[in-house]
Regions:
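Glycine-rich, basic loop-to-helix element that forms the pyrophosphate-binding segment
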Residues: 84-105
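A recurrent flexible, glycine/aromatic-enriched loop bordering the glycosyltransferase active site
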Residues: 169-192
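Donor nucleotide-sugar recognition loop
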Residues: 119, 182-189, 198-235
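Short beta-strand-to-loop acidic/aromatic patch adjacent to the donor-nucleotide binding site
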Residues: 107-119
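Short, acidic, metal-binding catalytic loop of nucleotide-sugar glycosyltransferases
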Residues: 43-53, 312-313
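A conserved acidic beta->alpha catalytic loop
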Residues: 60-69
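Non-catalytic membrane-proximal stalk/linker segments that position and tether the catalytic domains
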Residues: 1-22, 170-172, 247-289
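Conserved donor NDP-sugar-binding/catalytic core segment of glycosyltransferases
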Residues: 119-157
Length: 408
């Protein structure tokens, strides 16, 4: 009754939102930078958020440059302003505003967060909502950006603000083939279900870095899908408010906090995408109604999802994901993305576990050279390939990709 659980969460979240709630609550927090960031960001929201019923939730987090007066001057039919007198960080600003508002802080069915250094573009919110409403299991969606990480970057040609908006307007055409399910998301901007936000919005053990990774893992383990919308572009100004030394310190501490919380899972190495490996394994000449895909030692399964996304993008059919891993710490996350079997056993049990099963694609997550008997492993993989099936992996860490096909 998982779907019933989704519906009950939505119903509970909507109990205290008052009459005629908006579809989306757009949240924007600012601390100074009125002229070089805030005005541009707000004007972009007002100009480019069309055909979506939204409220504007504005938080002035202790600014001293006239930000509050600017917020008051904004014309929008559904606008709420919160003024935090002293800046103690972005999280405190959010919590202070939330505490002042009570149960009606987030009124929309969906919650969109826009950082002050992000400029939205034409149809950004309409496109994200379209993706979100395509499946009740989708919990969070994010757009592409010019400056981001984890394969969420899209490069558009422009040299001025106007050119950027024109290029983005041409680019932002909703296309389900460009929606990619991910293990984790980097939210330059984001749209999430308010029901999830109200249930779990942050682990305060993370100061800055890895808080988003934690959010991704939590929502996915609750049964929700995380979607990257490659069909939508927003502009993210490069840079960080932290000093380089403080940033690197927070990276190290956040990464270790994440490892401890998730019993050894590393948010970087265990969710790594290998685009070259997936594309060299894929056979674009052979569409199938259902592609059976097995990942061996694929950690949390990022490459399994990426392969599934590639098949979708090229109209090569659906995908049923299965996995075999030797380390138990990956089992839970693989179960969140695999509709097929997930085996967690020593490698010596691989052949017995796969008995009677064949796959159209087999992806090897670890370098072949790291196995004690690479030849025996390749023979097992070959024996469990369907006729015309393919298997691929890397010979060594960051070495060449090998791809083999079974003809008979």
């Amino acid at each position: 009754h998982q779907r019933d659980g989704f519906a009950r969460r939505e119903m509970a979240a909507n109990l205290c939102v008052g009459d005629e709630p908006p579809l989306v609550t757009v949240y924007f927090q600012a601390y100074n930078h009125l002229e070089d960031q805030t005005k541009m960001a707000i004007h972009a929201i007002l100009e480019n958020t069309q055909n979506v019923d939204y409220e504007l939730l504005l938080v002035d987090n202790g600014s001293t440059d006239g930000t509050l007066d600017f917020f008051r001057s904004i014309e929008h039919p559904r606008k709420r302003i919160f003024h935090v007198r002293e800046n103690r960080g972005a999280l405190f600003g959010y919590l202070a505003a939330k505490g002042a508002a009570g149960n009606e802080f987030i009124r929309g069915r969906y919650f969109a967060a826009i950082p002050s250094d992000v400029v939205v573009t034409k149809d950004w919110l309409k496109n994200l909502v379209t993706c979100m409403e395509s499946d009740p299991r989708i919990g969070m969606v994010v757009p592409a950006a010019n400056y981001t990480s984890y394969y969420q970057q899209v490069k558009l040609e422009f040299s001025t603000y106007g050119e950027m908006q024109e290029a983005a307007a041409a680019y932002n055409v909703s296309d389900p083939k460009k929606w990619e399910e991910r293990l984790r998301l980097i939210p330059t901007a984001s749209l999430m279900r308010s029901s999830l936000r109200k249930m779990y919005e942050a682990d305060y053990g993370f100061f800055y870095n890895f808080a988003d990774d934690d959010l991704s893992f939590t929502y996915r383990r609750l049964g929700y899908r995380l979607m990257f919308c490659r069909d939508t572009f927003v502009y993210h100004a490069p840079g960080t408010a932290m000093s380089e030394e403080a940033y690197q310190t927070d990276l190290r501490e956040g990464r270790e906090t994440f490892r401890r919380k998730y019993f050894g899972v590393d948010a970087w190495t265990d969710t790594r995408l290998d685009d070259e490996l997936c594309r060299k394994c894929m056979d674009p000449s052979t569409p199938r109604e259902d592609n059976r895909i097995l990942g061996i030692d694929v950690r949390c399964g990022a490459n399994l999802l990426h392969f599934k996304n590639c098949l979708r993008a090229y109209d090569l059919g659906r995908a049923t994901l299965s996995a075999f891993v030797q380390e138990a710490k990956y089992w839970v996350d693989l179960k969140t993305i695999c509709s097929g079997e997930v085996f967690c056993q020593p490698l010596r049990d691989l052949e017995a576990a796969l008995e009677g099963r064949t796959y159209d694609y087999i992806i090897l997550g670890m370098p072949l050279a790291d196995y004690e008997d690479p030849k025996a492993l390749l023979e097992i993989m070959r024996d469990h390939l369907s006729i015309g099936g393919r298997m691929a992996g890397r010979m060594e860490e960051d070495g060449e990709v090998f791809s083999l096909e079974r003809y008979e």
